[in-house]
């Protein structure tokens, strides 16, 4: 979480999910924002940060100590991606795609892409890498060989892709969703919207895709053919809002205005869950294996908190809130 104090300090915290108590804090100076943390199977945390003058990719051990850090060619707003064979892919704001050795941070290869901004990166089960910028979407093999390139696509910054049944779904700057054939890079369809940047697509087991739209306070549901299932105006700003999909068919999202986390029935978009969290939510929410929702919030002076609360209010373990102070 970014905070203001003696200079700008970004603190990656580890918090006990049962009690809400801090386990450790890892501070990174002089940065503001960056894509969310990626946690590897061995517990290593990888964090990219949006600053070009300091180390901007960090690997943090499970105990909160630094494993390695490296400086790439520009600030990084995009979320990183980790392959099964231990390669960390990072896409900088200069639209340079890097493949790093996840164990050491050594650069294996790098590739300059078209576009003023690097937006999103993902990996499929075969190890192919997908990168989206403000100008195009690319697919590469793990050895840097390019599979294909789809031009004239402006992917929303600080974004993610959804991959489902050999189709890549990307949300677009200035609104909309595009579906791309992952085998050859052809555009299958575009679902246009008109009210501002679209964020964080998420696909369910049936291939339906859900995404949020900044300007219209709307959550969209689209089927695998690109046809509308429903759209829901939730009456709250959705700035950098991403959803979490539960196994029982509820899409949870956080809102910037009205300081709420909402749950929408994915069959019809009806709001079936609502929790006031007291501060703005400007990021994706998460569902833990304990059936609790976790969200980060931000308030005045960029002082935020991590909140956890049970979806099922009959659970004995209900909720906690952990304040992230400036220091």
Question: Which ranges hold each PLM region?
Answer:
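Single conserved hydrophobic/aromatic residue that forms the stacking wall/gate
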Residues: 1-10, 325-327
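Conserved beta-propeller blade signature
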Residues: 4, 45-46, 88-90, 98, ...
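Short loop/turn segments immediately following the C-termini of beta-strands
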Residues: 8, 50-52, 93, 134, ...
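Short loop/turn segments that connect beta-strands within beta-propeller blades
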Residues: 16-19, 61-64, 101-104, 141-144, ...
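A short beta-strand motif characteristic of beta-propeller blades
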Residues: 21-26, 66-71, 106-111, 146-151, ...
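Repeated scaffold domains used in trafficking and secretory/extracellular systems
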Residues: 31-37, 75-81, 116-122, 155-162, ...
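Residue-level detector of Asp-centered blade-edge/turn motifs that repeat once per structural unit
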Residues: 39-42, 82-85, 123-126, 163-165, ...
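Blade-level signature of beta-propeller repeat domains, shared across WD40, Kelch, NHL, RCC1
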Residues: 282-324
């Amino acid at each position: 979480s970014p905070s203001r104090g003696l200079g700008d300090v970004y603190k990656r915290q580890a918090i006990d999910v049962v009690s809400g108590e801090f386990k450790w804090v890892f501070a990174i100076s002089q940065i503001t924002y960056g894509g969310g943390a990626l946690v590897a199977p061995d517990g290593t945390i990888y964090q990219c940060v949006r600053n070009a003058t300091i180390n901007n990719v960090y690997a943090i051990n499970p105990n909160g100590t630094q494993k390695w850090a490296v400086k790439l060619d520009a600030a990084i707003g995009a979320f990183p991606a980790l392959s099964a064979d231990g390669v960390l892919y990072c896409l900088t704001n200069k639209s340079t795609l890097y493949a790093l050795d996840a164990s050491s941070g050594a650069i294996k290869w790098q590739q300059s892409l078209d576009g003023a901004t690097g937006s999103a990166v993902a990996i499929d089960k075969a190890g192919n890498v997908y990168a989206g910028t403000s100008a195009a979407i690319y697919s590469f093999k793990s050895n840097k060989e390019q599979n294909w390139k789809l031009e004239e696509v402006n992917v929303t910054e600080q974004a993610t892709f959804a991959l489902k049944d050999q189709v890549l779904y990307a949300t677009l700057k200035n609104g909309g969703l595009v579906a791309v054939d992952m085998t050859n890079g052809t555009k299958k369809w575009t679902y246009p919207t008109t009210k501002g940047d679209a964020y964080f697509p998420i696909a369910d087991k049936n291939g339906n895709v859900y995404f949020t739209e900044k300007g219209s306070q709307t959550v969209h549901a689209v089927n695998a053919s690109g046809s509308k299932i429903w759209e829901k105006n939730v009456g709250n700003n959705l700035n950098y809002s991403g959803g979490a999909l539960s196994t029982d068919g509820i899409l949870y999202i956080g809102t910037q205005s009205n300081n709420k986390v909402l749950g929408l029935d994915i069959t019809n978009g009806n709001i079936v869950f609502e929790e006031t969290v007291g501060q703005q939510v400007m990021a994706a929410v998460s569902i833990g294996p304990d059936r609790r929702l976790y969200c980060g919030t931000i308030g005045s002076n960029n002082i935020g908190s991590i909140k956890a609360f049970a979806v099922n209010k009959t659970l004995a373990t209900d909720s906690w809130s952990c304040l992230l102070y400036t220091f």
